[in-house]
From Swiss-Prot:
SMART domains for the chain: S_TKc (SM00220)
Residue(s) carrying Phosphotyrosine: Y172
Keyword list, A-Z: ATP-binding, Kinase, Nucleotide-binding, Phosphoprotein, Serine/threonine-protein kinase, Transferase
Residues annotated as catalytic: D140
Modification Phosphothreonine occurs at: T170
Family: Belongs to the protein kinase superfamily. Ser/Thr protein kinase family. MAP kinase subfamily. HOG1 sub-subfamily.
EC nos: 2.7.11.24
Domain Protein kinase: 19-298
GO function terms (MF aspect): ATP binding; MAP kinase activity; protein serine kinase activity
Post-translational modification: Dually phosphorylated on Thr-170 and Tyr-172, which activates the enzyme.
Name the UniProt record assigns to this protein: Mitogen-activated protein kinase mpkC
Length: 370
């Protein structure tokens, strides 16, 4: 398999000769993303170089999780994995569909008409229904993770923080503005409902044009939430396990919930009704993704015959494993092999020589700790 190496934004970027016209799109903490032209499919694609994927055991595990999720989760409203390869410098490259913009950029450019907010919200909840049915929590929903093309098709991306529901889960996930209160209150146990809260914040932002809860810090974020929907009910407060957090909550002045319709008085009443069912302190009372698709606000697009769920739950058996980074590395390479094996059988895009090159690359790598 032949590679072309270039330097983009100060980073070595290696692609197979299959991809031409490589141009930078964005640089983040976990990767450099470029646009390119796939000379086989004759489609524009996005290529993400995962930065230092084997720098530590934790990072290697995160890399494995994202690769495995992208491979497994297949839905019209999720970003699709087109190709994956390992470069000579042993970096991981993920090739996905290329969409022209994201919701964050749209919201910065001009106010969003309600009909567009409605269509985007339907697609977001349709994608979440599928994700949640697979036993996956996205955990980092925000406008910049919702990609949109010129046809207004929306696709959820960035599954680097996605997790299974666990008895104890870390609290520092999701951009603050879209973070569910149970994450701030307990930092331990939560479920798919955190994505529903984030989706509600996104809907509110589409309707208002600005973030609903633009907290300056963790405490200010919680204060803004209580100022809008009132103090958390007793049954929620009783679930707080941190003494410091409980003290902060108890010290907050009493706030009565405000009627959201007074804040969104010029907006669609049905949109506000959906918001009220999403932005609830008690996660057990929030509307689910599947239920939201049946809500009157999304009724114009609702089609129960075309809102699929996952065929099976995602396999999280690896999640509790504490392995050295070289073991994760080997597992990632195995996933790459498996992906190309499936692609070779289904599409014919990958030649026998290409597949042999991947296999040879894996065989030649030594997976002992150095």
């Amino acid at each position: 398999m032949d590679f072309i190496r270039s330097e983009i934004l100060g980073t070595k970027f290696e692609t197979t000769i299959r991809y031409a016209n490589v141009r930078p799109v964005g640089l983040g903490a976990f990767g450099l993303v470029c646009s390119a032209y796939d000379q086989i499919t004759q489609q524009s694609v996005a290529i993400k170089k995962m930065m230092s994927p084997f720098a530590s055991s934790a990072i290697a595990k995160r890399t494995y999780r994202e690769v495995k999720l992208l491979k497994k989760l297949r839905h019209e409203n999720l970003i699709g994995l087109c190709d994956i390869f390992i470069s000579p410098l042993e970096d991981i490259y993920l090739v996905t569909e290329l969409l022209g913009t994201d919701l964050s950029r749209l919201l910065r450019s001009k106010p969003l008409e309600n009909k567009f907010a409605q269509f985007f919200m339907y697609q977001l909840m349709r994608g979440l229904k599928y994700i949640h049915s697979a036993g996956v929590i996205h955990r980092d929903l925000k406008p910049s993770n919702l990609l949109i093309n010129e046809n207004c098709d929306l696709k959820i991306c960035d599954f680097g923080l996605a997790r299974v529901q666990e008895p104890r889960m870390t609290g520092y996930v999701s951009t603050r503005y879209y973070r569910a209160p149970e994450i701030m209150l307990t930092w331990q146990r939560y479920g798919v409902e955190v994505d529903i809260w984030s989706a509600g914040c996104i809907l509110a932002e589409m309707l208002r044009g600005v973030p609903l809860f633009p907290g300056k810090d963790h405490i200010n974020q919680f204060y803004l939430i209580t100022d809008m929907i009132g103090n958390p009910p007793l049954e929620v407060i009783e679930k707080i396990t941190s003494k410091n957090t409980r003290h902060i909550v108890d010290s907050l002045p009493h706030k009565e919930p405000r009627q959201l319709k007074t804040i969104f008085n010029e907006e669609d009443a049905e949109a506000v009704d959906l918001l009220e069912k999403m932005l609830l302190f008690d996660q057990s009372k929030r509307i689910s993704a599947a239920e939201s698709l049946e809500h009157p606000y999304l009724a114009p697009y609702h089609d129960p015959t075309d809102e699929p769920v996952a065929e099976e739950k995602f396999d999280w058996s690896f999640n509790d494993a504490d392995l050295p980074k070289e073991s994760w590395k080997y597992m990632i390479y195995s996933e790459v092999l498996d992906f190309h094996s499936m692609e070779a059988h289904s599409s014919g895009y990958m030649t026998q020589d290409d597949f042999a090159s991947v296999l040879e690359f894996v065989d030649q790598n030594q997976f002992a700790e150095t």
